[in-house]
């Protein structure tokens, strides 16, 4: 039975993503100066006000002034450097409330002479891979990200004038009964713009310089529908139009809804939080399975208890596409990979200040970024199972 599946992405100027980028920028700054730091940073944006709050335990002297300066650079990077869109890095108001991590949490997480490092919280995490693309991502989320990347590019490079930083995309893909993508059935693309720019010019520019530059021709048909700025006007955008908050784009950050999600956000969290580190590891493992050719798709779930090092469960599902059983794959993972938090952190190099590059256009599938969890360097372990 064929079906249509849709996924969305948002631009780097979307208020929720600006919040995420500020949080990850502060996290990277702290980790650069103290790789053992504990961070759980949240950011909220409302109109022209920026709130930065949460918990940080570090030997680095992190002042409010340093945090605000980091936030200003992050906001500028996201495109808010012009007062014509009301919200901008220089004129925004900043409020900071950062305090230390709870001693009760540290008691269960920190490594001591008598206890190994435990998980920073309980929770379930999913990783996923599918052979739709060379990035091993489902095609709808991959194309949605490509649209928002291109949208930012044409604005920043001046290819299209009169655009604002805020924007969103959505792509619908028709799949056949074997879960193979056939064609794109619908594209939604919304971009903030200056008041002087007409809807007709926005539509023409988006078709020519974004959509037709990104969507492969063989996926477009005469029946493909296009919805470009469908409300007719998108001048008020960013935090002025909608408040922004860290952790509100979980599905954009992962697999566009094609796989399940455990509910934990990524941005602002150091790797002792398994919401982030275990999700990255689960993605890495799913990629090895699919990249080895023993399955066309793979979903992996990990679950942890706070303060406990070993995962309480490991679940593998290849949805009937694998050449060996799910149980054999799970046993192979348990045999060859250490899934304790400290081991994951060391294996993936997650004490390094690498996180702000993950914030925009998804945390997965960025082959050009050389992120450790995107490498296909252990596929031989699974190739040997066949």
From Swiss-Prot:
Top EC group: transferase
Keyword S-adenosyl-L-methionine: no
Catalysed transformations (reactions): L-methionine + ATP + H2O = S-adenosyl-L-methionine + phosphate + diphosphate
Listed InterPro entries: ADOMET_SYNTHASE_CS, S-AdoMet_synt_C, S-AdoMet_synt_central, S-AdoMet_synt_N, S-AdoMet_synthetase, S-AdoMet_synthetase_sfam
Localization annotation: Cytoplasm
Taxonomy of the source species: Bacteria, Bacillati, Mycoplasmatota, Mollicutes, Acholeplasmatales
Name of this chain's protein: S-adenosylmethionine synthase
Keyword ATP-binding: yes
Superkingdom: Bacteria
GO CC annotation: cytoplasm
Cofactor dependence: Mg(2+); K(+)
Gene Ontology biological process terms, A to Z: one-carbon metabolic process; S-adenosylmethionine biosynthetic process
Gene: metK
Gene Ontology molecular function, alphabetical: ATP binding; magnesium ion binding; methionine adenosyltransferase activity
Residues that bind L-methionine: 55, 101, 242, 273
Primary subcellular site in the record, as a coarse category: cytoplasm
Positions with a binding annotation for Mg(2+): 16
UniProt entry keywords in alphabetical sequence: ATP-binding, Cytoplasm, Magnesium, Metal-binding, Nucleotide-binding, One-carbon metabolism, Potassium, Transferase
Annotated binding of K(+), by residue: 42
